[in-house]
Amino acid sequence: MDVTIQHPWFKHALGPFYPSRLFDQFFGQGLFEYDLLPFLSSTISPYYRQTLLRTVLDSCISELMTHRWFVPHQPHAGNPENNPIKVRSDRDKFVIFLDVKHFSPEDLTVKVLEDFVEIHGKHNERQDDHGYISREFHRRYRLPSSVDQSALSCSLSADGMLTFSGPKVQSGLDAGHSERAIPVSQEEKPSSAPLF
């Protein structure tokens, strides 16, 4: 029995004019646009070429992501580890805004250890909409050397925004580095902190 052996390059070289056999029999991969529109296909094997639809989608997505109004998806704010944090260091003040809406002032401890402020929150298991949950987080921030550590303050607003702040001293003055706990005071009004 004579079997004609044809080099696969010969078939692909005539690709646009040569009809494909049952969509090239790539059953597990679905249809490619060159199966439906063979004049758009090239002579490269379908395993190595990128589909036209994929090329168009990639260019559209990259174009959308370059716009200033595009904001990537933020994780759910149920976990304090994922909450947005805002740290500001102006000429005369250092401020940290932290969303801790699931914690009461009794659940929070704020300490200053040398050049760092440590914020720790922990509450025992309690019931919420989905069952029982316990939460805990630990944050540590380096304080600028010019912050007056004797005048640090910390407050928790009614909407759960923790604000840690301290004034900066002029250069040449001692900032008073020591270890001490900062009490968390409860406010009755919502925070005026900027939205994230």
Swiss-Prot record:
N-acetylmethionine: modified positions: M1
Positions bound to Zn(2+) 1: H123, E125
GO biological process: lens development in camera-type eye; negative regulation of apoptotic process; protein refolding; response to heat
sHSP domain segment(s): 76-185
Pfam family, one: Crystallin
Gene Ontology CC entries for this record: cytoplasm; nucleus
Thylakoid found in the keyword field: no
Modified residues (Deamidated glutamine): Q6, Q50, Q170
Subcellular location: Cytoplasm; Nucleus
Biased composition (Basic and acidic residues): 176-190
Binding sites annotated in the UniProt record for Zn(2+) 3: H177
Disordered: annotated span: 170-196
Post-translational modification: Acetylation at Lys-93 may increase chaperone activity. Undergoes age-dependent proteolytical cleavage at the C-terminus.
Function: Contributes to the transparency and refractive index of the lens. Acts as a chaperone, preventing aggregation of various proteins under a wide range of stress conditions. Required for the correct formation of lens intermediate filaments as part of a complex composed of BFSP1, BFSP2 and CRYAA.
Subunit structure, interactors included: Heteromer composed of three CRYAA and one CRYAB subunits. Inter-subunit bridging via zinc ions enhances stability, which is crucial as there is no protein turn over in the lens. Can also form homodimers and homotetramers (dimers of dimers) which serve as the building blocks of homooligomers. Within homooligomers, the zinc-binding motif is created from residues of 3 different molecules. His-123 and Glu-125 from one molecule are ligands of the zinc ion, and His-130 and His-177 residues from additional molecules complete the site with tetrahedral coordination geometry.
Name of protein: Alpha-crystallin A chain
